[in-house]
């Protein structure tokens, strides 16, 4: 019989206490996605993967992550080059500001941590562009330190399992208390896989879910995941957006500086120079583009590649 919302709300309980860890871990071992970064415990490799996964589809990251690590196999190799080289390698993954932050983070790791990615969450979160989720993910997947990761998939599972909308703190507390001792890596990967494969956003496969007989929602009534903290909604259209123009310009600049006269064409808006200048201003503010004598360039490539 499914757990009622009242039963869940009445006690401070957790997935780990109410469901035998082996129950879910068995499903995880049989359904684990074959993702290349899961074979690595190298903190730098894991950090790169997690930064990429923040806002890029898993299949796209699986394609680009190995290539990025060939170019930048360790912290030192990333920190030692101009930002332009990291941005150029990142181009095509979207949200290119992440490349700037990753380059800055590599510099901080070299300067303050002797080139070693730190283990402590506070030190990880002090790195540029690294928030609580990414810090927890590095701890769990590289260092295998007791930590629970709550992305949109896990937040959705927790909301449905409890049958109610959760605040970010409630979701994180539930996840933190649920990690079986000594199984931090496999437990977190299993929850991520469950959310990606079975407890999906649009068409959850409740009949095949290993949590179905203990789930408060079980596909009946209003979905409690809607409106829960951490559960993402739909993205705004990419086609014709400022983001598309930003990406086009960064891709063009990977080949060298772009003159002011070519700016609008490079961004895909040949008839809208005002828009091009407005949007390039945001790229300059984000540290992705610099103004140079020949027009615009990636930082560090003002004189050409």
Task: Please state what every model-predicted region is.
Residues 1-13, 32-33, 230:
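Short, contiguous pre-domain boundary segments
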Residues 284-296:
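A short, conserved structural fragment
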Residues 294-304:
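Accessory beta->alpha helical hairpin/"wing" motif in late/C-terminal subdomains of nucleic-acid enzymes
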């Amino acid at each position: 019989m499914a757990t009622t919302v009242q039963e869940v709300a009445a006690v401070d309980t957790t997935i780990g206490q109410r469901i035998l860890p082996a129950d879910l871990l068995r499903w995880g071992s049989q359904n684990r996605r074959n993702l290349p970064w899961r074979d690595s415990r190298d903190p730098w490799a894991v950090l790169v993967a997690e930064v990429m996964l923040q806002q890029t589809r898993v299949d796209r990251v699986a394609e680009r992550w190995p290539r990025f690590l060939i170019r930048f196999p360790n912290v030192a190799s990333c920190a030692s080059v101009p930002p332009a080289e990291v941005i150029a390698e990142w181009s095509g993954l979207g949200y290119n500001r992440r490349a700037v932050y990753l380059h800055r983070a590599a510099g901080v790791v070299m300067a303050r941590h002797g080139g070693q990615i730190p283990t402590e969450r506070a030190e990880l979160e002090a790195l540029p562009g690294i928030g609580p989720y990414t810090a927890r993910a590095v701890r769990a997947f590289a260092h295998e330190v007791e930590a629970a990761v709550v992305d949109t998939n896990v937040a959705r599972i927790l909301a449905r399992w409890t049958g109610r909308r959760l605040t970010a703190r409630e979701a994180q507390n539930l996840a933190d208390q649920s990690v079986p001792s000594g199984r931090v890596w496999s437990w977190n990967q299993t929850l991520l896989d469950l959310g990606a494969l079975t407890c999906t956003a649009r068409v959850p496969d409740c009949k095949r879910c290993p949590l179905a007989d203990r789930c408060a929602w079980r596909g009946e009534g209003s979905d409690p995941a809607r409106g829960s903290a951490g559960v993402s909604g739909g993205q705004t259209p990419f086609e014709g957006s400022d983001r598309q123009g930003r990406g086009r310009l960064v891709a063009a600049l990977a080949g060298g500086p772009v003159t002011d006269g070519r700016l609008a064409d490079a961004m895909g808006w040949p008839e809208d120079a005002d828009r091009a200048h407005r949007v390039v201003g945001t790229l300059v503010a984000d540290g992705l583009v610099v103004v140079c004598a020949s027009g615009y360039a990636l930082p560090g490539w003002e004189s050409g590649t």
